Amino acid sequence: MNNEESNAKLRFIISGGGTGGHIFPAISIADALRRRYPECEILFVGAEGRMEMERVPRSGYEIVGLPIKGLDRKHLLSNYKVAIAVIRSMRLANKTIRNFRPDMVIGVGGYASGPTLRRAHSLGIPTLIQEQNSYAGVTNKLLSRGAHKICVAYPEMDKFFSPEKIVFTGNPIRPEIEFGHPSRSESLRFFGFEQSESPVVLVVGGSLGALTINKSIADKLGKWAESGVHLIWQTGKNYIETARKAVENHPGLKCYVNDFITRMDYAYCAADLVVSRAGACSISELCLLGKPTILVPSPNVAEDHQTKNALALSTRAAAVLIPDTEAIELLTDTALSLVRDPAELSSLSEQIRTLAKPQAADRIVDEIARIVEHEKRAN
């Protein structure tokens, strides 16, 4: 059997999701697998009702949804439903793996990766985990015992995983962000701005929005209007109507506001300064592009991992960190002061760029290829 015939038969399952921070890296890995093995088959396994069930098919891949849910830590008595969902998910994961017969299963974190990778382990199918954050999630920590390799984006992850399994690859970046190079004038036009000397601030709260960041901007729109700074504001779907009404009350404000920005390559290119949550994949994009950044970590995430992500940058003078509890008071004034300080913007850009790990998806596929080849030789 020649190499092309062997590659044509390769099948991969990619499992996980829940937020853009899991889904976008998963899709980037899938795209890199297709570039390496054009004839391979890829199946996603996600969680019913979560974002991946829409985003993955839109990217051209099939997906199976498991009825998995997370634990309700506030109402522990209701978790019997979670236990039932886990049992059903294990059965469906077993059926999916047996029918699809993958050569390898890749876990990207999130509820669905648990049943899928556990079943793969029990069937002797090799697995690889991609951990996006500087503080490993519970699911990935549990699954790491059976994984062949664990691809990480931060140093010092041996406090969570076996050192011999760790590969420092960085986080996969969406191809349009990593490889797209739009012009600034084109980017400004997309948001309805004319080419001018006015600085631009991009405010994003992750794929689901961020209430504190939104309120911090909405409550101080008068200052934004007076400053002459142009504002690109992604609110998430839950805040968009409130934000639009607030913007209408400030006719002098130069602001593009939407619930979701379809062209983040344009948004990053146009921005002189970015205000963002501290999700791992957002940080990886900002590092790669060298964007001066204010990070406002979400307090509503497991084990406060966004604060740990943000500290990994702020302690290196690579970003400004504002705690969520202080954002309403400090965020607008800090952003408006910083965006008018070219020396500080330049310093932040230099420092954040040193943390970039380009072509992470291809590095991860390198590890996948080594494991697949090793399994072929062993069998």
UniProtKB/Swiss-Prot annotation:
GO biological process: carbohydrate metabolic process; cell division; cell wall organization; lipid glycosylation; peptidoglycan biosynthetic process; regulation of cell shape
GO MF annotation terms: UDP-N-acetyl-D-glucosamine:N-acetylmuramoyl-L-alanyl-D-glutamyl-meso-2,6-diaminopimelyl-D-alanyl-D-alanine-diphosphoundecaprenol 4-beta-N-acetylglucosaminlytransferase activity; undecaprenyldiphospho-muramoylpentapeptide beta-N-acetylglucosaminyltransferase activity
Catalytic activity as recorded in UniProt: di-trans,octa-cis-undecaprenyl diphospho-N-acetyl-alpha-D-muramoyl-L-alanyl-D-glutamyl-meso-2,6-diaminopimeloyl-D-alanyl-D-alanine + UDP-N-acetyl-alpha-D-glucosamine = di-trans,octa-cis-undecaprenyl diphospho-[N-acetyl-alpha-D-glucosaminyl-(1->4)]-N-acetyl-alpha-D-muramoyl-L-alanyl-D-glutamyl-meso-2,6-diaminopimeloyl-D-alanyl-D-alanine + UDP + H(+)
Gene3D superfamilies cross-referenced by the UniProt entry: Glycogen Phosphorylase B (3.40.50.2000)
Pathway: Cell wall biogenesis; peptidoglycan biosynthesis
GO cellular component, one term: plasma membrane
Listed EC numbers: 2.4.1.227
Membrane topology: Peripheral membrane protein
A Pfam family that the UniProt record links to this protein: Glyco_tran_28_C
InterPro entries: GlcNAc_MurG, Glyco_trans_28_C, GlycoTrans_28_N
Compartments where found: Cell inner membrane
Major enzyme class: transferase
Disulfide pattern: none
Keywords (A to Z) from UniProt: Cell cycle, Cell division, Cell inner membrane, Cell membrane, Cell shape, Cell wall biogenesis/degradation, Glycosyltransferase, Membrane, Peptidoglycan synthesis, Transferase
Binding site for UDP-N-acetyl-alpha-D-glucosamine: 19-21, 133, 174, 207, 261, 306
Family: Belongs to the glycosyltransferase 28 family. MurG subfamily.
Described purpose of this protein according to its UniProt entry: Cell wall formation. Catalyzes the transfer of a GlcNAc subunit on undecaprenyl-pyrophosphoryl-MurNAc-pentapeptide (lipid intermediate I) to form undecaprenyl-pyrophosphoryl-MurNAc-(pentapeptide)GlcNAc (lipid intermediate II).
NCBIfam families for this protein: murG
Protein name: UDP-N-acetylglucosamine--N-acetylmuramyl-(pentapeptide) pyrophosphoryl-undecaprenol N-acetylglucosamine transferase
